[in-house]
């Protein structure tokens, strides 16, 4: 399993399933909007807006029908399943071509969401961030993008002049994703087993991203429970989550627990293995020399 910036490419592929990838989803949104518009009574003169009585135009605009060529291009883009870097480049090109051809498409949010994932896999993190932001501007509840950005931004370089702001964004994205995940509905074409694994991966990534963001913001005590949730009992834990958990626990002088976290990281194939082995060795040595409270 290949790890990219501490996040598995497998995890991102699973998270992409949360993105609405079929015409049915977009049509469902359009149909629901039209239904709500038909049911909404005309605004009465003198009424004041409120949650119970929002003021809306007497005749709500009806979305334009989808151009058959646009629909075909959208389907073609979402039917792509890249298996190698060349395929990822083709997927990105198809998405960019769609945006140029249909800049006002009702499918824009879904295309930006898919492109954000594709740019992560390339990897082109600047474009991932740019398209992810555009996707969230159109739908702030896109769990795929929330988790992607929330899991990736905390792993950025500290010398980025905007890094502090990105950490705050990541914290916000991960918290919102964790709010949405318990009630997220199963996408079409996904089995119950796949959906269970999908939610587990998304939840793990959100907790891990939040924990790393908190750790790098200096909120070490708050970071520990998030990183523990990201690593405890999950099927495919992220070695970076284990590693940062070890660092956090060691900084709190909980050396025995830190050694366990580093050991968890050392057992996973990644570029962090040597550092985790050393971290485990150092933590065990400090734990052995640490004064223990007297037994009662």
What do these predicted ranges mean?
Residues 101-108, 135-143, 161, 182-201, ...:
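Short solvent-exposed coil/turn linkers within tandem alpha-helical repeat scaffolds
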Residues 34, 187-188, 200-216, 225, ...:
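Terminal, low-structured helical/coil segments at or just beyond the last alpha-helical repeat
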Residues 73-76, 112, 146-149, 153, ...:
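TPR repeat positional signature
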Residues 117, 151, 155-158, 212, ...:
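Residue-level recognition of tetratricopeptide repeat
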Residues 24-110, 293-296:
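N-terminal leader/linker segments that initiate helical-solenoid repeat arrays
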């Amino acid at each position: 399993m290949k790890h990219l910036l501490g996040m598995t490419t497998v995890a991102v592929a699973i998270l992409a399933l949360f993105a609405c990838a079929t015409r049915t989803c977009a049509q469902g949104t359009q149909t629901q909007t039209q239904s709500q518009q038909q049911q909404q009574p005309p605004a009465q003169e003198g009424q004041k807006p409120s949650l119970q009585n929002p003021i809306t135009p007497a005749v709500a605009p009806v979305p334009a029908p989808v151009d058959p060529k646009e629909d075909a291009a959208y389907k073609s883009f979402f039917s792509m399943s890249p298996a190698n870097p060349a395929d990822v480049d083709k997927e990105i090109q198809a998405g960019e071509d769609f945006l140029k051809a249909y800049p006002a498409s009702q499918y824009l949010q879904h295309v930006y969401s898919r492109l954000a994932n594709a740019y992560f896999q390339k990897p082109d993190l600047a474009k991932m961030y740019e398209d992810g932001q555009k996707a969230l501007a159109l739908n702030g509840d896109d769990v795929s993008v929330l988790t992607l950005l929330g899991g990736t931004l905390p792993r950025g370089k500290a010398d980025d002049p905007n890094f502090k702001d990105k950490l705050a964004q990541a914290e916000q994205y991960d918290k919102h994703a964790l709010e949405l995940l318990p009630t997220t509905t199963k996408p079409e074409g996904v089995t119950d087993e796949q959906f269970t694994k999908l939610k587990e991966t998304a939840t793990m990534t959100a907790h891990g991203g939040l924990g790393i963001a908190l750790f790098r913001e200096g909120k070490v005590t708050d970071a520990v429970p998030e990183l523990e949730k990201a690593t405890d009992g999950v099927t495919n834990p992220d070695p970076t989550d284990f590693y940062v958990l070890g660092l956090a626990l060691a900084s709190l002088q909980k050396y025995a627990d830190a050694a366990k976290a580093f050991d968890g990281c050392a057992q996973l194939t990644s570029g962090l293995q040597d550092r985790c082995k050393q971290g485990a060795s150092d933590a065990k040595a400090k734990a052995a020399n640490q004064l223990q409270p007297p037994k009662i």
